[in-house]
């Protein structure tokens, strides 16, 4: 745990980490069950500003806004994971595209090789764009 500055009593307080589920349930007290922010913060033993931030984030996420912080609603968590997966796949795709470019910057094209009815072999791949069709 990361230690934060001392509180009024001189005791060093540790930074608490809360799960997305805890944050969501705490904010739902205000949004869904009509607690005041102060009452919900007191009931869940968190700071007033923390509870205010969670409530705002829950409302924003329910309106479809992408959170800047870690998402707390299941839908936004899934969206974040899908975006990460898409980004990873796009990066892998870019790597594969770059791998098909040979040392002189020419693409080794499967379409060109098969376009003249030839077979994909080493001669066709390294022909450097020369037509091997007879």
Curated annotation (Swiss-Prot):
It comes from the Bacteria. Keywords: DNA recombination, DNA-binding, Transposable element, Transposition. GO terms for molecular function: DNA binding; transposase activity. Gene3D superfamilies: Homeodomain-like (1.10.10.60). One of its GO terms (biological process) is DNA transposition. SUPFAM superfamilies: Homeodomain-like. InterPro entries: Homeodomain-like_sf, RD_transcriptional_regulator, Transposase_8. The keyword Calcium does not apply. Coiled coil: none annotated. Belongs to the transposase 8 family. Involved in the transposition of the insertion sequence IS911. This is Putative transposase InsN for insertion sequence element IS911A. It comes from Escherichia coli (strain K12). The gene is insN1.
